[in-house]
Curated annotation (Swiss-Prot):
Binds 1 Mg(2+) ion per subunit. The keyword S-adenosyl-L-methionine does not apply. Pathway: Purine metabolism; AMP biosynthesis via de novo pathway; AMP from IMP: step 1/2. Pfam families: Adenylsucc_synt. Belongs to the adenylosuccinate synthetase family. It catalyses: IMP + L-aspartate + GTP = N(6)-(1,2-dicarboxyethyl)-AMP + GDP + phosphate + 2 H(+). GO terms for molecular function: adenylosuccinate synthase activity; GTP binding; magnesium ion binding. GO terms for cellular component: cytoplasm. The keyword Hydrolase does not apply. This is Adenylosuccinate synthetase. Its cofactor is Mg(2+). It comes from Trichoplax adhaerens (Trichoplax reptans). It comes from the Eukaryota.
């Protein structure tokens, strides 16, 4: 917890080979500002990795006066001396990757392909996966989950069914790839009669893709293992989506299709658990959720709309408006139990600069009883009442604060209360969009 000068007693861990491996995870329902914290740390990183998800993720980084939008690429790609790794747990839509690299390079980032390593074990997302994603959502009617329609669920489904196509298939015998691709399309057409796929055109396109991406394809498990053996490596793992969207631990079925917690780091990159020591959970000073699903502290009021407007809460991937609510300590505690957070970053504190008072959700009440843990059952979660504490706002602009002591007393008290309630030291405080608008406490 905090020492007398409000500085937590915390020393960044380095292993016996003097490596530093830091994992950045979303500690809410996504859109917490993970990209900004990764970008802040990436200036000193040797390697930045993505371990799961696909281009359903959306990370925004504001650096050097420019805004960058990431979906598949690790945010570290904008650093000139940093290697970016797309791990085996990621599902890759190659047309989306090509478009993203083109946009990033137009924004001034050079040599993306030469800085990128793509796992040969990663599975591919095809256009028909995306079309099927939309059709599945239509079938659900009123029970739709709010998918991004990027084909992520169908791609992970084919992976689990052991009929998916991997990057190594594309790099191998193209006749064999063709046969597998046609069989996969045939299976999808049986399920979705309205599915339209120009098989020959798609195969021609993927043959071109294969030639372009070949130099970037690597056994990333071996690569990362060898880099750790060398020692003195700074490695960042950039989690996508968020722990509350995790397939196993999230608010099922309103979740994504991958493991978004610490387990997904190990399975999505082939990293032994013993290599991980620093796990930074990213949370907004309030909380947001895009798409359907339970949201206990949701503010269906002018206050929620105010957070939405000031915070510019629109999805990077879909453009949908995000629902907003008060910070939820029950969620943060649950995420910590799953992922073992060593610290947290509280972003967008400045969004609440004009509020007379701010609240923090501290407990869930169901049928008059305080719940001891986060409920798995949707029917229970949808009925909980939230117990809040109320704190005075700070009513002043904090966007130029660069030290914790620069913050107004009430803003400091809010951060320290989050520390007290969660039991997790707050390492970073975000007070604006840009990289430098961040207070680092340790």
């Amino acid at each position: 917890m905090s020492s007398s000068n409000n500085q937590p007693n915390f020393a960044p861990f380095r292993d016996e080979k003097n490596n530093s491996l830091v994992v950045i995870l979303g500690a809410q329902w996504g859109d917490e500002g993970k990209g900004k914290i990764v970008d802040l740390l990436a200036s000193q990183a040797d390697i930045v990795c993505r371990c799961q998800g696909g281009n359903n993720a959306g990370h925004t980084v504001v650096a050097n006066g420019k805004t960058y939008h990431f979906h598949l690429l690790p945010s570290g790609i904008i650093q000139s001396n940093c290697t970016s790794v797309i791990g085996n747990g990621v599902v890759i839509h190659l047309p989306g990757l090509f478009a993203e690299i083109e946009a990033i390079e137009k924004n001034g980032v050079q040599d993306c392909w030469s800085k990128l390593k793509i796992s040969d074990r990663a599975h591919l997302v095809f256009d028909f996966h995306q079309e099927a994603d939309g059709l599945l959502e239509l079938e659900k009617g009123d029970s739709k989950i709010g998918t991004t329609k990027k084909g992520i669920g169908p791609a992970y489904s084919t992976k689990a069914s052991r009929v998916g196509l991997r990057v190594c298939d594309l790099m191998g015998d193209f006749e064999d790839f063709t046969k597998k691709f046609k069989n996969l399309v045939k299976g999808y057409r049986k399920r979705f009669s309205e599915l339209e796929v120009d098989v020959e055109k798609e195969l021609e396109r993927y043959k071109r893709y294969a030639d372009i991406i070949r130099p970037s394809i690597e056994d990333t498990v071996f690569f990362l293992s060898e880099e750790l053996k060398k020692g003195n490596k700074n490695i960042i793992v950039e989690g996508a989506n968020a722990v509350m969207l995790d397939l196993d631990f999230g608010t099922y079925p309103y979740v994504t299709s991958s493991s978004c917690g610490i387990g997904g780091v190990c399975t999505g990159l082939g990293l032994p658990p013993s290599t991980i020591r620093n796990v930074v959970g990213i949370c907004k000073a309030y909380i947001t959720r895009v798409g359907a699903g339970d949201f206990p502290t949701f503010l269906d009021s002018d206050i929620g709309t105010k957070l939405q407007d000031i915070g510019q809460e629109f999805g990077t991937t879909t453009g949908r408006r995000r629902r907003c609510g008060w910070l939820d300590i029950v969620v943060l505690d649950y995420v910590n139990r799953i992922s073992g957070l060593t610290s947290i970053a509280v972003t967008k504190l400045d969004v609440m600069d004009t509020f007379e008072e701010v609240k923090i959700g501290t407990a869930y009440i169901h049928n008059g009883q305080k719940l001891k843990s986060f409920p798995a059952d949707h029917s229970i979660l949808s009925e909980v009442e939230v117990e809040y504490i109320t704190m005075p706002g700070w009513k002043q602009n904090i966007s130029l604060c660069r030290k914790f002591s620069d913050l107004p007393e009430n803003a400091q008290a809010y951060i320290l209360k989050i520390e007290e309630l969660s039991g997790i030291p707050v390492q970073f405080v975000g007070v604006g969009k840009s990289r430098d608008a961040t207070i680092r406490r340790f």
